[in-house]
Design a protein with these regions (language model features):
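Glycine/Thr-rich phosphate-binding loops that ligate phosphate moieties of nucleotide
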Residues: 1-176
Length: 176
């Protein structure tokens, strides 16, 4: 659970060089390598369960940063902050890792499953409760804003990605 993984990961200040690439079904944006596989790198005799759990949370955060970087590269738009909801938004270690990996503030939704809130906003606009989607979404306020407090090693992340890629060459060569 988000709570349990936070408790475990919070026992150490960092992952001690352990990296996890969450490519359990290959890698999507921006890598598009269906033959990539989940990879755990940098384990030593001193690696603890807490280091591995923190590395998993940081790996997921790095994938989020990959997607933000892809959006910025494709659109040339500046992404000033990230808004998140869902179960992982209740994991302080993950939220901080996401802020650190993206180098952006992360705004945590007060509603854990905000998909329903978005549907409510659209319904409200459809029945003229709000005159526009901007008016509706202006009513949303984050429950918390988390700022980056250190930089995660994106160069080491890119090295980990390169090691996870092309694990199954026949799948890696697929192009859609």
């Amino acid at each position: 659970s988000p709570e349990d993984s936070h408790k475990i990961a919070a026992q150490v200040p960092d992952s001690a060089g352990v990296m996890f690439v969450p490519a359990l079904f290959g890698l999507g944006t921006p890598h598009w390598d269906y033959g990539a596989r989940g990879t755990l790198l940098g384990i030593t005799r001193g690696t603890s369960r807490s280091h591995v759990v923190r590395a998993v949370l940081e790996g997921i955060a790095h994938r989020g940063a990959d997607m933000v970087d892809a959006v910025v590269a494709a659109t040339q738009l500046e992404v000033e902050s990230i808004r998140i909801d869902g179960g992982m938004s209740r994991n302080p270690t993950f939220v901080q890792a996401l802020a650190n990996a993206t180098r952006r503030n992360v705004e945590v939704s007060p509603v854990t499953e905000a998909t329903t809130l978005g549907a409510a906003f659209l319904a409200g606009v459809a029945v003229s409760f709000w005159p526009s989607i901007n008016e509706a979404t202006n009513t949303w306020k984050p429950s918390q804003i988390v700022s980056p407090d250190k930089e995660l090693d994106r160069a080491q992340w890119h090295e980990a990605i390169s090691r996870a890629r092309n694990w199954i060459p026949a799948l890696s060569s697929l192009d859609f």
